[in-house]
Curated annotation (Swiss-Prot):
Protein name: Purine nucleoside phosphorylase DeoD-type
KW Transferase (keyword) present: yes
GO molecular function, one term: purine-nucleoside phosphorylase activity
Entries under Gene3D superfamilies matching the protein: Nucleoside phosphorylase domain (3.40.50.1580)
Organism listed in the record: Haemophilus influenzae (strain PittGG)
Role this protein plays: Catalyzes the reversible phosphorolytic breakdown of the N-glycosidic bond in the beta-(deoxy)ribonucleoside molecules, with the formation of the corresponding free purine bases and pentose-1-phosphate.
Gene: deoD
């Protein structure tokens, strides 16, 4: 047990899928897993363990922003022996060639947060996903006939940013999606010897203001979850 997770030892699988919303974690567990057990509920940050096609997998929410997700990721790795974390969530985009409902695999994550500089002695840390996990996710998407984009994300500290000019910089540098957690999770995984990947569905376009409906979000979200889950099985077979 930790101050933030009240699961007993051995309650989590070695692979954990992490959406931001704890209710989305519950949805994933109840929709895609079998033999589901709720293993933690401190602060209503729900966590579950079950099986997917016979493979033990856990699902747990991580909240919003790098500070929140970093706490949960660290404790899962160091206190519960988790080896792989897959963040599954939504993101915005600033690029006109990236569309709402696209699925993005975050090979790397830029950030305006200083957390990785703090842990890396004020030097720049290249926050990247585990290559094998990213490759497995691409293979899972291809097997489903789903197109995915692969590249850089931007993990922002501010949801309501006053610096709209930064969107132009992101577009120039080819940032595929804007979210709030990937760089932190990649940093934590690197620090504690684990592996991590982020998969996002584009829910809104920052330039055009196009947004998905609740029903559309659920449909595309399901594609992303199936890609993430199947990627675990592919990774096991490699």
């Amino acid at each position: 047990m930790t101050p933030h997770i009240n699961a007993p030892e051995g309650a989590f699988a070695d692979v954990v899928l992490m959406p931001g919303d704890p209710l989305r974690a519950k949805y994933i567990a109840e929709t895609f897993l079998q033999d589901v057990v709720e293993v933690t509920n401190v602060r209503n940050m729900l966590g579950f363990t079950g099986t997917y096609k016979g493979r033990k997998i856990s699902i747990m929410g991580h909240g919003m922003g790098i500070p929140s997700c970093s706490i949960y990721a660290k404790e899962l790795i160091t206190e519960y022996g988790v080896k792989k974390i897959i963040r599954v969530g939504s993101c915005g985009t600033v690029r006109m060639d990236v569309k709402v409902r696209d699925v993005i695999i975050g090979l790397g994550a830029c950030t305006d947060s200083k957390v990785n500089r703090i842990r890396f002695k004020d030097n720049d840390f290249a926050a990247i996903a585990d290559f094998d996990m990213a490759q497995a996710a691409v293979q899972a998407a291809k097997a489903k006939g789903k197109a995915v984009r692969v590249g850089n994300l931007f993990s922002a500290d501010l949801f309501y940013t006053p610096d709209v000019e930064m969107f132009d910089v992101m577009e120039k540098y080819g940032i595929l999606g804007v979210e709030m957690e990937a760089a932190g999770i990649y940093g934590v995984a690197a620090e504690y010897g684990a592996k991590a990947l982020t998969i996002c569905t584009v829910s809104d376009h920052i330039r055009t203001h196009e947004q998905t409906t609740a029903e559309e979000r659920q449909l595309t979200f399901n594609d992303m979850i199936e890609i993430a889950l199947d990627s675990v099985l592919i990774g096991d077979a490699q």
